[in-house]
Amino acid sequence: MNRRLLVRSISCFQPLSRITFGRPNTPFLRKYADTSTAANTNSTILRKQLLSLKPISASDSLFISCTVFNSKGNIISMSEKFPKWSFLTEHSLFPRDLRKIDNSSIDIIPTIMCKPNCIVINLLHIKALIERDKVYVFDTTNPSAAAKLSVLMYDLESKLSSTKNNSQFYEHRALESIFINVMSALETDFKLHSQICIQILNDLENEVNRLKLRHLLIKSKDLTLFYQKTLLIRDLLDELLENDDDLANMYLTVKKSPKDNFSDLEMLIETYYTQCDEYVQQSESLIQDIKSTEEIVNIILDANRNSLMLLELKVTIYTLGFTVASVLPAFYGMNLKNFIEESEWGFTSVAVFSIVSALYITKKNFNSLRSVTKMTMYPNSPANSSVYPKTSASIALTNKLKRRRKWWKSTKQRLGVLLYGSSYTNKANLSNNKINKGFSKVKKFNMENDIKNKQNRDMIWKWLIEDKKN
């Protein structure tokens, strides 16, 4: 029985694959087909974008290009490519030091790193590595810096090959030629910026022009960048002079300790430090001149703006006067009875009244405008009465108040005489005498109290002195 039931149940059982996959859902397939086509289009667009990007070549990422000078100043190799990793291991450098000498066009902070076997230099357009018998000058991708580097090549070749000054070490001669090239580049940049800025400032003294102000703003930004560059180089040289360990490591031919004498190297660095400091001071003074000129120009523009506003207010006041003058004739110009049609003085009186009212309104507005324009810092200060004299309105107000006080005092006395008779004056005099006597009594009492307090203080001091003696 159980077997039969089991067979029937198995025969009635339908596999799940027939239910789910026997009749596929066509909307689901369409939707899936749409999403797949969209994904294919997105992948093709992404593939095109990736193909449009320029890949970094292996030579740029794994090699470094530089020109090498030997101990006699001759060029051994021109723009020779070295593997970066082998170059780092050969000169005992770290991978982080490669950022200082990489031939990228990105400007970074100037640095001079003193290693045990070499000196790594990054100053403006110059990226070099100095050893005791070799100099590596790294190539640049900036076309404007390439011309300056070519000048450096000639200077290095002449400086290192000369045998006149044998007392100076090889590394110091290479360092001096690099400093000379850097200072000459700074000098040319400063002369260019200063000539243009001074010319614009001289032109602005004669005429304030919008185009000149715009040109001055652009050149002031360039001058600020130059000032920051020179300031960084000056601070770098200052740090070198203050650090004895770096000065000792800059001797590669003959090793020295921090306790030795570095007078020759200090004199070399001090010379170019003062020259760089001069460029810093001159550029800073020129920036201050530009700022002061900008402030003066702003003051002039504000004054012109205020004068235009005053002109507009004056025109408005005149317009108001004409409007007031035309109000009354406009009323009488209506085709209605005004009861002065047959009067002989009607026209004259209306015209005179309108003109007088217009003149009165105009004068009053001009007086108020004049009082607003004449502003002082401390108009009511008694110490500055000679510098800031009182206006006629304030003097008239004080005189008016004085007259009112006198009038009130006289009217008070007259009312007292009318109400109380002649005895009022006697009473007033008696009250004044009583008040004076009261004040004198209070004053006398205060003086007596002061004397008593003084005597008591003297007695207390005497007692204290006697107690100390005992």
From Swiss-Prot:
Compartments, as annotated in UniProt: Mitochondrion inner membrane
Lineage top rank: taxon: Eukaryota
Mode of membrane association: Multi-pass membrane protein
Transit peptide start and end: 1-32
Claim: Mitochondrion is one of the keywords in the record: yes
Motif YGMN: where in chain: 332-335
Mitochondrial intermembrane-facing ranges: 334-344
Residues exposed to the Mitochondrial matrix side: 33-314, 362-470
One annotated Gene Ontology cellular component of this protein: mitochondrion
GO molecular function: cardiolipin binding; magnesium ion transmembrane transporter activity
Keyword terms, alphabetized: Ion transport, Magnesium, Membrane, Mitochondrion, Mitochondrion inner membrane, Transit peptide, Transmembrane, Transmembrane helix, Transport
General remark: Present with 768 molecules/cell in log phase SD medium.
Family of this protein: Belongs to the CorA metal ion transporter (MIT) (TC 1.A.35) family.
Function per UniProt: High-conductance magnesium-selective channel that mediates the influx of magnesium into the mitochondrial matrix. Essential for the splicing of mRNA group II introns in mitochondria by affecting mitochondrial magnesium concentrations, which are critical for group II intron splicing. It also suppresses a variety of mitochondrial intron mutations and its absence may disturb the assembly of mitochondrial membrane complexes.
Name of the protein: Magnesium transporter MRS2, mitochondrial
Native source species: Saccharomyces cerevisiae (strain ATCC 204508 / S288c)
Biological classification of the source: Eukaryota, Fungi, Dikarya, Ascomycota, Saccharomycotina
